Amino acid sequence: MGHIMTYINDCQGVGKTTLTFHTVWRLHEKGYRILVIDFDGQGITFSSMCGLDTGILKEKVKEKQSLYHVFAGDCKVQDAMISVTERLDVLSFGMNLSYMQPMTSIEQFRQLIDEIKDQYDYIFIDVNSSPDWRYALILSVVDYAIIPIDCSKSANLLDCMGILNIISSIQEQFHSHVQILGFVANYVDDNDIQLYDDFKRRMALYRYKVFDTYVPFSDVIDAFTDGPFTIRQKQPVYDLFDKLIEQLAII
């Protein structure tokens, strides 16, 4: 049975998709079978980061074989899968859903996940940039949530209350078993080290974990690629995400 995970925050620009991409890439390199459900239908999506041609996504939508059409009852989930490599599949909306009404119930989404979760070691859900009805769906099925933060913007607990309240509300309303693994500091530069240390101390007072491994801004590479799931990788990022995965305790 696969672990179901998400990097989630109600703030934009904290690197949710970037962290998802690098974590998935590293687990993929270790030989694990992974599914990424791409809930973000606009901007820099996981699908675009791993080198999927936009033409493939458009063709899937045209043929009514996207996650949107799975929810609409137009196709089966297996028909909507896009195989990036033999160990990595992507299930994408392929369109902008930010202005659409809720398309499926939480129970239906849970049933969909139950159909496929045993086929993978890990299922990562890449969330949309801003909270909407999709957050309830995502948090109702994931086992673990990791909250990425930008220390220069989120230097205290008050700045993180939005996503913590959202998670708490979903847990209560929909009997979600999601567990918060902790906070990971992303896009940290030399000027943010003190802010990171201060944030870590403050969150410890409230018994929230902040991972020792933070992501330096200088080591976050351009993840756009020329081919399916190839990457111009730098060794510091390679080592860094190995350490982060170890701290997440997901292997």
Task: Give residue spans per PLM region.
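Anionic-ligand binding region
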Residues: S154-V178
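Inter-motif core of Ras-like GTPase G domains
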Residues: R134-K153
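Walker A/P-loop phosphate-binding motif and the immediately C-terminal alpha-helix
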Residues: G2-Q42
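Phosphate-binding loop that captures ATP/GTP phosphates
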Residues: R33-I34, G41-D89
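C-terminal boundary of histidine-terminating zinc-finger modules
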Residues: I221-L244
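Cytosolic-facing regulatory segments adjacent to core modules
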Residues: V77-A80, V84-P131
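Beta-strand-loop-alpha "switch" segments that mediate conformational coupling across diverse proteins
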Residues: Y187-F229
